[in-house]
């Protein structure tokens, strides 16, 4: 009875959201074909991945050309541009690249087409966590286009074997002190990066943030407190340098590249930078999956999911383009541009591994990854996580109070 009631409430909620925001747009233009527009944040890859993808498609589809609408590099601006467009029910955006945690929000509001029936895609070749990141309430709403996972960068000249657990890693901090460098850093400034870093350590210790309904808070648990405590204690005792709570991606990367850290949590893009001739750690570092409680940790997933707009006039073309984006051909272009692919087989490709030696570690990291909280209220949930985690780090809240604050913030996120 309880399960049936929850299912009924969930269905009613989804129906209400669709009615209020998308109307019957989800049932319209299902067979429409013609030119479409693809929307994604600024393409910062050296090889111009998005341009290559679209050129290949356009060469094979002269009557269904794709135009690239390039957004800014700022994630908040990307989100707000899409939201403004969809609130107005405009049909100018046909396929949109959603940052992973936005998928649930856009699905709940009826803004993107579920990938079922004639829009279904083959997810078998894809990494399972990437598919989970595009799923809301048991239904697939987007196709994973490219992914991302956290990696542990470590000084292999000082630490021959990478640690597998937080206890093992922090137990090696004396090596950092002996070499007059910091032990560990991540992205701990009060922004989305802190949500990511906090989520990873809490998930690694068995905690979670929201229930399957995307709304019920679950963070106030012994497991969540244990995870956050590890991070807070490491900062208090100096294993994490004091300046590290000002670090975003760039600052943390610079600290590692200049030889000031023994361990760093960061994304795969850093590998090429750290191995450049200008880097102080060129040929002196390795990469591994993030540490966990008793074994490999729980990376947070990054990347983009490609979704079909509910307001598109040419949804059949849009569906074919989405399928193309996850094809072997397209994903080879993605991977060659140093963007982590969503196809599992490419992580074992010898040619790609020769170019990107971190791929085996990244595959292992993504295989154990956990999506950021899957909720239609993600911006508010993320704010609750980062605000309270930062308060615990800087000592204005205890770990228990910070976790209780997250619980309350998640509880009120939809109000």
Predicted feature residues:
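Short, solvent-exposed loop/beta-turn-alpha elements that line the ligand-binding surface or hinge
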Residues: 117-126, 187-192, 207-226, 275-283, ...
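Short helix-initiation/N-cap motifs at beta->coil->alpha
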Residues: 71-81, 101, 167-168, 243-257
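Conserved N-terminal structural module of periplasmic/extracytoplasmic solute-binding proteins
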Residues: 1-104, 279, 292-294, 409-415
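Glycine-centered hinge/linker elements that transmit conformational signals in sensory
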Residues: 173, 215-245
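Short glycine- and hydrophobic/aromatic-rich loop-to-beta-strand nucleating segment
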Residues: 150-154, 202-203, 306-308
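Paired acidic/hydrophobic, glycine-rich loop segments that form the ligand-binding mouth/hinge
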Residues: 94-97, 262-266
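C-terminal lobe and pocket-closing loops
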Residues: 267-282, 291-387
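Hinge/lid segment of periplasmic solute-binding proteins
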Residues: 100-149, 161, 168-170, 282-286, ...
């Amino acid at each position: 009875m309880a399960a049936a009631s929850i299912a009924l409430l969930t269905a009613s909620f989804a129906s209400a959201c669709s009615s209020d925001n998308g109307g019957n747009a989800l049932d319209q233009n299902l067979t429409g074909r013609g030119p479409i527009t693809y929307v994604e944040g600024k393409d910062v890859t050296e090889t111009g991945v998005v341009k290559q993808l679209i050129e290949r498609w356009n060469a094979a589809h002269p009557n269904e050309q794709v135009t690239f609408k390039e957004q800014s590099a700022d994630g908040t601006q990307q989100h707000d541009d899409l939201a403004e467009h969809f609130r107005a029910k405009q049909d100018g955006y046909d396929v949109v690249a959603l940052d992973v945690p936005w998928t649930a929000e856009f699905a709940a509001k009826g803004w993107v087409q579920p990938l079922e029936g004639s829009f279904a895609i083959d997810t078998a070749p894809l990494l399972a966590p990437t598919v989970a990141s595009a799923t809301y309430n048991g239904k697939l709403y987007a196709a994973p286009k490219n992914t991302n996972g956290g990696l542990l960068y470590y000084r292999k000249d000082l630490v021959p074997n990478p640690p597998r657990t937080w206890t093992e890693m922090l137990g090696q901090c004396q090596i950092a002190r002996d070499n007059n460098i910091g032990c560990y850093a991540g992205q701990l400034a009060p922004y989305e990066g802190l949500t990511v870093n906090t989520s990873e350590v809490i998930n690694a210790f068995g905690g979670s943030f929201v229930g399957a309904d995307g709304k019920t808070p679950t963070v106030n648990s012994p497991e969540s407190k244990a995870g956050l405590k590890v991070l807070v204690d490491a900062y208090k005792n100096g294993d994490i340098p004091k300046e590290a709570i000002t670090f975003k991606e760039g600052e943390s990367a610079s600290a590692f590249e200049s030889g000031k850290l023994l361990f760093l949590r960061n994304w795969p893009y850093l590998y090429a930078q750290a191995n450049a001739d200008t880097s102080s750690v060129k040929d002196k570092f390795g990469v591994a999956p993030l540490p966990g409680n008793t074994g490999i940790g729980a990376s947070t997933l990054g990347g983009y999911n490609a979704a079909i707009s509910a307001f598109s006039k040419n949804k059949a073309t849009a569906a074919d383009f989405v399928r193309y984006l996850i094809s072997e051909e397209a994903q080879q272009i993605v991977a060659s541009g140093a963007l982590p692919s969503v196809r599992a087989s490419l992580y074992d490709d010898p040619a790609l591994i020769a170019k990107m030696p971190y791929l085996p570690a990244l595959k292992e990291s993504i295989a154990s990854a956990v999506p950021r909280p899957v909720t239609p209220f993600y911006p508010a949930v993320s704010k609750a996580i980062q605000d309270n985690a930062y308060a615990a780090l800087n000592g204005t809240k205890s770990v228990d109070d910070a976790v209780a604050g997250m619980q309350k913030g998640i509880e009120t996120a939809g109000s």
